[in-house]
Curated annotation (Swiss-Prot):
Assigned keywords, A-Z: Ribonucleoprotein, Ribosomal protein
Family statement: Belongs to the universal ribosomal protein uL30 family.
CDD domains on file: Ribosomal_L30 (cd01658)
GO cellular component: cytosolic large ribosomal subunit
NCBIfam families on file: rpmD_bact (TIGR01308)
Keyword NADP: no
An annotated Gene Ontology molecular function: structural constituent of ribosome
Gene Ontology biological process terms in this record: translation
Protein's name according to its UniProt entry: Large ribosomal subunit protein uL30
Complexes and interactors: Part of the 50S ribosomal subunit.
Species the sequence originates in: Rubrobacter xylanophilus (strain DSM 9941 / JCM 11954 / NBRC 16129 / PRD-1)
Amino acid sequence: MSQLRVTQVRSTIGAIEKHKRTVRALGLRRIRDSRVHRDTPQIRGMIAKVRHLVRVEEVED
């Protein structure tokens, strides 16, 4: 299964609370913080909600 590297590129200051919680649920705390997640529909949905705050790259296993 492929994996996704999610990196926070913009601050959550001024973002709506739902987006702040989604970024935290992805494991991101600050700008340039990265986490690797399995490529699942649930993770893709979370990324879609905060796509203006994060950058996504595919990672080969």
